[in-house]
From Swiss-Prot:
This is Glutamate 5-kinase. InterPro entries: AceGlu_kinase-like_sf, Asp/Glu/Uridylate_kinase, G5K_ProB, Glu/AcGlu_kinase, Glu_5kinase, Glu_5kinase/COase_Synthase, Glutamate_5-kinase_CS, PUA. It catalyses: L-glutamate + ATP = L-glutamyl 5-phosphate + ADP. GO terms for biological process: L-proline biosynthetic process. Belongs to the glutamate 5-kinase family. ATP binds at K14, S174, D175, T216, G217, G218, M219, E220, T221, K222. PROSITE patterns: GLUTAMATE_5_KINASE, PUA. Pfam families: AA_kinase, PUA. Gene3D superfamilies: Acetylglutamate kinase-like, PUA domain. Residues 279-357 form the PUA domain. Coiled coil: none annotated. One of its GO terms (cellular component) is cytosol.
Amino acid sequence: MREILKNVRRLVVKIGSSSLTHPETGKINLAAMERFVRECADLKNAGFEVIIVSSGAIAAGMGRLALPEKPKNLPEKQACAAVGQGVLMHLYEKFFSEYQVIAAQVLLTGEDLAVRKRFLNAKHTFSALLNYGVVPVVNENDTVAVEEIRFGDNDTLSARVAVLVEADLLVLLSDIDGLYTADPRKNSNARFLPEVLEINEEIEQLAGGSGTAVGTGGMETKIEAAKIAVNAGIPMVIARADYGNLRRILRGEEVGTFFYPKKKKQWKKQWLLSGARVQGSIIVDLGAEEALCSGGKSLLPSGVLGVEGEFPTGAIVAVKNLKGRVIAKGLTNYAAQDILKIKGLHSWEIADVLGHKDYDEIIHRDNLVLVD
């Protein structure tokens, strides 16, 4: 199955803080960073399109500010990120320039990928950068993006970027070889998993909190990234950030843990799964669940039991079954308050209740994507 990696031309590579810093001091490891840039530059010069999602801004800020340990409160973390992002980007520009490659800084927040208009604008910007032959270096805008600092969002950010740029592959480089049955640093009996066919409950349970002193993410966020990528039809590999591993992965060698992709979805449905901000939920009955999941139908008011939250027309909503499990996401044709009035009714009754009928469906099937 790894044979598909030989056809990759556009890849997103996320490198973690632990792979760019000295473990003793938390400061930037210049030799490690130079080796990483050299391999990416070599891939670029060989005809690959490379997008980097780089952690390390907070760690770089710690070094510049001479802090002995990672700050614990949010304002100090954001201050470190503000100082460190400039340091980090200066180093990327310096190292890439040695190989005649231009690097560009791209700072994103969750909002940039959650709002469709901003998502499209970011998509066009990346397209222009790649057409210019530039290597985009992406980071969460740590200074303002509270969620990233709290939850280690660069793993899932990289998956969202992979969806955004329609990448052929996502690679997460870390200080660990891939996914194990237990943390190999704590359990000598841990067994390495070279491939994951499906991200089921068992796989999710294997992901423990293994963040490092300078990083914010662990295996749990990497599994979340894998869900986003494979559901969008993008294969993903978790591997150790050793020099040469990217080349080996692209040759189809068994490096790291390979996550098998699912069938590629239309870009709108990829956005709904990966970046769109959910504003509320619609609860459906068994008949509607079957119609959506097995019949590929639109969601009609007759199958709706209720709503959660308040949301306007055109909002992104989750569709939940009777057990509370999210089975789909979609763009709603009606606001929450109107859905409450027409739930359980036939489509021809909508106008009688609301005084107008803009659509027969609550969510049209073209604007709905199933959550696997």
